Structures are given as structure tokens and as C-alpha cells.
């Protein structure tokens, strides 16, 4: 989750139980299962509040297959491991060595924050081992652009074609691409178009009452 929405939850435990975030964990589990190996080295770009890393260490059914996790985020101020990651082979930094190679890269809701998105994709490709896998999620459809995108610092939204073309241009082979949460599209469309939003809002992800 983006650090801008960090104050919307009281704890990491509360955050990882949000239905939106839990759904994303399914895709993380799926890519590890697809990779089908042990001693996996994972890099997460834009790790933010680290909910994905928390899941990988504490809740994923594939935790035993993971050798190391590196969380990268230029906005991280505290690079020490949190309590829940003290005994794990997990590290945090603001940038990654250009020589490091990963089996799996996670970049979930990250690409839209980068103006030169094609450059970022090439960098991520170069970080992957030859048989490595990259999991990307991005906000969909430019016509759903709203003040929430501005609040989060987005440059654009994508559709399947634009993301597919961008990935191929970066030298990546696309294995699977599809829309997540498509069942809420009509509601999101109406909310974006009918309700005014304050650009200083603290985000869409909030804890349940």
C-alpha cells in the first residue's frame, strides 16, 4: 500500500486483512506457485507499507520456498526490519544494486508513479534472472482518472493493450494479463464521475467500521 495511505490503518495486521489487499495476496501466491522452485529470492519495488512482505513472511502458504526478500522504496525512512520481520531473511533499502538478480519481482501499484515507465520496466527486466517472473499491478482505464490519482502521485492509468505493449517494448514476455476487481467497475465509474473528490483526501483504502 502507498505510504500516503498509511494513516488509514492502525496496524499492519489490520491492513493485511482489508479485502482489497487480501485479494492481491492471491496473485502473489499464484506467481510463487507458478515459479515452482525453492530458495526463491524476491524483490519488491515500491514496497510502501510492506503489507506484501508481511504476507510473504507470515501468511503465505509458500513462505518455506522463499530464501530472501528485499523491499525497495525511495520513500522509506526507517530501513530497520519491523518486529514481524526480525527473524527473517528480509532487508529494506531505498535502492537496489544494479548487479543483484531476483527470481521474482513484485511491482504492485508502482509503475503509475513513474513518469518514465518504460525505463523502469527495462530496469526491472535487467534485475530478473533469465527465468525470472515479474508481477505488476496498475490502476486501469484513463477515463477513471480522478483526484485520488493526483493525491497518490500517479502519472497515468493503463489498459491491457497499453501495458502489454509497454512490457513487450521493454523486452518482457507477457505470460498473463487481465483486469482485477472488474466486478466493481460500474460502481467505481459512477463514483468517479458523479461525486466530487477533494485532492487532499487521504485515499480510497480505509479500514472497515
Give a label for each model feature.
Residues 1-100, 104, 108, 118-121:
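Conserved N-terminal segment of class I S-adenosyl-L-methionine
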Residues 3-4, 13-17, 92, 184-209:
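A C-terminal cap/extension of S-adenosyl-L-methionine-dependent methyltransferases
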Residues 11-12, 135-156, 162-165:
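Short, glycine-/aromatic-enriched active-site segment of Class I SAM-dependent methyltransferases
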Residues 37, 115, 129:
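Short conserved AdoMet
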Residues 109-113:
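A short His-aromatic
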Residues 118-133:
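A short glycine-rich, Lys/Arg-flanked "PGG" loop and its adjoining helix->strand segment in the class I
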Residues 172-182:
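Conserved S-adenosyl-L-methionine
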